């Protein structure tokens, strides 16, 4: 079923708030330091990702919406890294440079899929003149459909009331991811998106959903809000609006690896969906689905339109789906960061039979994720003859995607998937039949990358060709 996503390409969103750079150092841990009882990490991979308000803007841009980012930075390598990375994903940056302060940076050291320590490099921007931020907001109000204020209490949003007033006067909704217990600062906002802990720190501990709703409605009245969305981790999220019944949405997360940046994803998808012209209820629906995807990834991350589409169909990227090559490469990269072993196989899979099902189940048991590469219709004709395939590519991929053993499906146009395999480089390449490992397309590339190649047996008596012959014979009787 095709899911109608919002018209993100028509949506314009400005994000104003605390901009930061998230750095990740990865490496193996093999010993304890002789200097202190701490592990020694041999760093072999370094990543830099936009965090805080910058991650919100990334999430908006990843959906195909027009994202503008305003915030405070220093004049340093971190600011340059942020600008470069954000420009690459089409986020329009308009930073206010403060030469007396460093750009806020958070460094995480990870090993064996565990975060060992986080180091923060920052000085609060409190006291910095907010007027340049106000000017940037004023200039953009005529071309945006939503304003996001991303508050991490680092000093960029000391004049929240002025920012809310500017936007509301222009008829632009204001969405705020709050910080701290002083919700008076956010009076008059269109929507606040606290998590449950943040909400209860202001409203008090809630023993039931009824109590949460009652206290949430009181907050809406006390602070003149248009709506309140409480994100509740494994309990999903709850939308509260005056004169409307509460909307409780269960979580769609299938696997949770890291909640870092999940709130950024939620408010980013909310803003982009509202700016595209959808209702708040629809925006919450898409945001809930996106949150279920992003918590299955390690570190601050974003959600693509195809991932969102799969998620609202109940098929999040952490599990299954038909993908393009680029989407598959991203999914494999995320899986590897989680320490998962990726297995890949290929074939026509024209009329799926018990032999195919058994073979794919056995291949899946050899790792954590199974990719199935499928010959296109043209490729199948060249390989099998003009009468094939019996089932077109789209139908073959849909049937494969229904198997529990199959995680990702991708098609290829060539006679063999050698180019595709060389681009993915699975940990294990599997082929069924009487092949020798060295005869399998892509084997040399996989071996050169340190991977494995294996041949599995097909179930005796199962053959698409035999099935077709039997059908033809029966029809001739």
From Swiss-Prot:
**Role according to the record:** Catalyzes the ADP transfer from ATP to D-glycero-beta-D-manno-heptose 1-phosphate, yielding ADP-D-glycero-beta-D-manno-heptose.
Provide the assembly information.
Answer: Homodimer.
Q: Which gene encodes it?
A: hldE
* PANTHER family the record matches: BIFUNCTIONAL PROTEIN HLDE
Q: What is this protein called?
A: Bifunctional protein HldE
- GO CC list: cytosol
Keyword set, alphabetical order:
ATP-binding, Carbohydrate metabolism, Kinase, Multifunctional enzyme, Nucleotide-binding, Nucleotidyltransferase, Transferase
Q: What family is reported?
A: In the N-terminal section; belongs to the carbohydrate kinase PfkB family. In the C-terminal section; belongs to the cytidylyltransferase family.
Q: For this protein, what is the EC number? A: 2.7.1.167, 2.7.7.70
Query: What SUPFAM superfamilies does the database record attribute to this sequence?
Result: Nucleotidylyl transferase (SSF52374), Ribokinase-like (SSF53613)
The record's catalysed reaction(s) read: D-glycero-beta-D-manno-heptose 7-phosphate + ATP = D-glycero-beta-D-manno-heptose 1,7-bisphosphate + ADP + H(+); D-glycero-beta-D-manno-heptose 1-phosphate + ATP + H(+) = ADP-D-glycero-beta-D-manno-heptose + diphosphate
List of catalytic residues:
264
**One function term, GO molecular function aspect:** heptose-1-phosphate adenylyltransferase activity
* Positions of the UniProt region annotated as Cytidylyltransferase: 344-477
Which parts of the sequence are annotated with region: Ribokinase? 1-318
Q: Tell me what organism the protein belongs to.
A: Salmonella paratyphi A (strain AKU_12601)
According to its UniProt entry, one GO biological process term is: ADP-L-glycero-beta-D-manno-heptose biosynthetic process
Could you tell me which pathway this protein works in?
Nucleotide-sugar biosynthesis; ADP-L-glycero-beta-D-manno-heptose biosynthesis; ADP-L-glycero-beta-D-manno-heptose from D-glycero-beta-D-manno-heptose 7-phosphate: step 1/4; Nucleotide-sugar biosynthesis; ADP-L-glycero-beta-D-manno-heptose biosynthesis; ADP-L-glycero-beta-D-manno-heptose from D-glycero-beta-D-manno-heptose 7-phosphate: step 3/4
Specify which residues bind ATP according to the UniProt entry for this protein.
195-198
């Amino acid at each position: 079923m095709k899911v109608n996503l919002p018209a993100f390409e028509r949506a314009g969103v400005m994000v104003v708030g605390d901009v930061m750079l998230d750095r990740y150092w990865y490496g193996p841990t093999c010993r304890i330091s002789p200097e202190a009882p701490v592990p020694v990490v041999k760093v072999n991979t370094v990543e830099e990702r936009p965090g805080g308000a910058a991650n919100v803007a990334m999430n908006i841009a990843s959906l195909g919406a027009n994202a503008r980012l305003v915030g405070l930075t220093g004049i340093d390598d971190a600011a340059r890294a942020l600008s470069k990375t954000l420009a690459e994903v089409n986020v329009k940056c308009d930073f206010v440079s403060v030469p007396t302060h460093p750009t806020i940076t958070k460094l995480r050291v990870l090993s064996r899929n565990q975060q060992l320590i986080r180091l923060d490099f920052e000085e609060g921007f409190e006291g910095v003149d907010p007027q340049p931020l106000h000017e940037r907001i004023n200039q953009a109000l005529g071309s945006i459909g939503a304003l996001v204020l991303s508050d991490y209490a680092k000093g960029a949003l000391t004049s929240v009331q002025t920012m809310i007033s500017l936007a509301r006067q222009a008829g632009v909704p204001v969405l705020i991811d709050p910080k701290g217990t002083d919700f008076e600062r956010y009076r008059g906002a269109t929507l606040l998106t606290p998590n449950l802990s943040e909400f209860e720190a202001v409203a008090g501990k809630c023993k039931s959903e009824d109590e949460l709703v009652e206290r949430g409605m009181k907050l809406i009245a006390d602070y003149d809000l248009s709506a309140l969305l409480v994100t509740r981790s494994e309990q999903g999220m709850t939308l509260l609006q005056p004169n409307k019944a509460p909307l409780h949405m269960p979580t769609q997360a299938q696997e949770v690896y890291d909640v870092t940046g999940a709130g950024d994803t939620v408010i980013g998808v909310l803003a982009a969906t509202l700016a595209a012209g959808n209702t708040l209820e629809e925006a919450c629906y898409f945001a809930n689905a996106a949150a279920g995807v992003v918590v299955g990834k390690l570190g601050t991350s974003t959600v693509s339109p195809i991932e969102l589409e799969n998620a609202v169909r109940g098929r999040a990227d952490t599990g299954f789906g038909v993908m393009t090559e680029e989407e598959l490469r991203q999914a494999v990269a995320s899986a590897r960061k989680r320490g998962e072993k990726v297995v890949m196989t290929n074939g026509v899979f024209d009329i799926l039979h018990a032999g195919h099902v058994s073979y794919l189940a056995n291949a899946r048991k050899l790792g954590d994720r199974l990719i199935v590469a499928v010959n296109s219709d043209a490729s199948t004709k060249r390989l099998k003859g003009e009468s094939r395939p019996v089932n077109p590519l789209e139908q073959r991929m849909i049937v494969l995607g229904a198997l529990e053993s199959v995680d990702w499906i991708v098609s290829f146009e060539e006679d063999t998937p050698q180019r595709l395999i060389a681009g993915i480089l699975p940990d294990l390449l599997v082929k069924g039949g009487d092949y020798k490992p060295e005869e399998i397309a892509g084997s040399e590339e996989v071996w050169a990358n340190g991977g494995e190649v294996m041949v599995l047996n097909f179930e005796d008596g199962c053959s698409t060709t035999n099935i077709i012959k039997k059908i033809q014979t029966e029809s001739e009787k």
